[in-house]
């Protein structure tokens, strides 16, 4: 009888721990530099983390960003950064989450990673009966044609940084000073404008739960903050 090759044994993917760090309100650059350092120095033993933050007002241009999409920034600073995507705005009342995940350990590719983030946002909005959708070729989440969440990611050595921004209860006027995500005339909206809660904590709790469900994570909140100091 011919020998039958044994099927390779694949260990089950168990829920993986991930620390959650709530950074509160922070300027953009110190957080950006900190997640770069975290990603550059991590190895296969480094645990995954989710950083949650609100940023002081800033426009960021991704690697594909074109300066002509910044129409009239006024007093708001404009930064060229190393994420994917075009131009977007960050400001108070917007929930920003930076997943610092090892995709190899999670056994997913970049496309699945993006889809899971979008689905977590869609399911979060569903908690308040807000029907949202994704668009082919235009990462992010939309409600009735208006963008409510933007994605801008970077993957280095299989590990993610940068992430998502979710308009909860914010002044949307600065979006009129740019072509959001490079699309002229793209409308934006917020959770509050669509009848959802104004409280950041309520939205934050639901979104973190949905991200944990999508990625198979056990969240471990910690009060310790990353080193946000800037090199001299």
Curated annotation (Swiss-Prot):
Keyword Cytoplasm: yes
GO molecular function (one): lipoyl(octanoyl) transferase activity
Stored InterPro entries: aa-tRNA-synth_II/BPL/LPL, BPL_LPL_catalytic, Octanoyltransferase, Octanoyltransferase_CS
Localization in the cell: Cytoplasm
Active site per UniProt: 181
Pfam families, per database record: LplA-B_cat
UniProt superkingdom: Bacteria
SUPFAM superfamilies cross-referenced by the UniProt entry: Class II aaRS and biotin synthetases
Domain BPL/LPL catalytic: 44-219
EC number: 2.3.1.181
Family designation: Belongs to the LipB family.
Described purpose of this protein according to its UniProt entry: Catalyzes the transfer of endogenously produced octanoic acid from octanoyl-acyl-carrier-protein onto the lipoyl domains of lipoate-dependent enzymes. Lipoyl-ACP can also act as a substrate although octanoyl-ACP is likely to be the physiological substrate.
HAMAP family in the cross-refs: LipB (MF_00013)
Protein name: Octanoyltransferase
Native source species: Xanthomonas campestris pv. campestris (strain B100)
